[in-house]
């Protein structure tokens, strides 16, 4: 009974405690929501692929054509070249600033033009022959040039007329000779003439000749070049260095004194020369030399020479080829028979033009591959 009452009062007490408990208030503060993190995916970098370089094709230069040959040239007088640098040759050959391929020069040698009634020797022509020759040159379109123009053409292909002639008068003639025969061609066609002058100073006659030539030189249409001092003994094999230097340096000294110029060409007296005389001439800065051998016309890097004595020309024609310096042994036509060669020379020029055009693409391709990286493009 006692235990039942104790249990009753305990339950009653607990019920009272439960009834007096305050109700739980609802929260008034809003809960701050933490946003859900959104993951932004960056695009994956695509690796740059470096292309493997394509191998540059190696260009093989074509074979260059052979030296121009022509049926109008005597086979015992073959053309010789003299420019060792192939690239420089092609550059100068095809430059639009220079002479066109096929440009040709005729050097013509004069000794004496005889008046009517005079006896005509082996190396002389009459006035009528002179007029025919000059008229033949003019009618075919030839134009006269100076020694300096010829040197520029032969060395660098500088521009000259496509058909050119250089008139060279050997030995010593009075001013009246030049005024009578060559001045009309200067006045009419602007053709200069070269006076291959013997620079002797032996007596009063020589002194008077020098005065005469000084006046003629000052007029500007006569181009003076060296023809020795003693002259009568050629500078061929066997003569002394002292004699050769007297002929070459003696001409230079005389030209400086009387003409205020230095000759650039030696017209070999008697046509005679040697390896030694050419070596000494080069040391004295002569640029050109002329023989008396009529082997053919001249073109850029193309000089016809003889390599040995032949029955065609005989022993008097000293071979120039073995000298290995074509510009110092240039051939000359004789005034006595130059006229009959003019048509063939024109044909040689025409054939050379055709041959050059036939091979132009090949030569320009070679230049582009081998030469352009160093010399640049051809203007």
Annotate the PLM regions.
Residues 18-20:
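Bacterial signal peptide processing site
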Residues 182-190, 204-226, 282, 319-323:
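Acidic (Asp/Glu)-rich catalytic clusters
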Residues 149-150, 159-191, 219:
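Substrate-binding cleft of extracellular glycoside hydrolase catalytic domains
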Residues 53-167, 234-236, 240-265, 271-379:
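C-terminal active-site subregion of NodB/CE4 polysaccharide deacetylases
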Residues 14-16:
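C-terminal motif of bacterial Sec signal peptides marking the signal peptidase cleavage site
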Residues 25-60:
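Extracellular mucin-like PTS domains
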Residues 108-113, 198, 226-231:
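Short loop/turn segments at strand-loop or loop-helix junctions that form parts
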Residues 2-10:
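Sec-dependent signal peptide recognition
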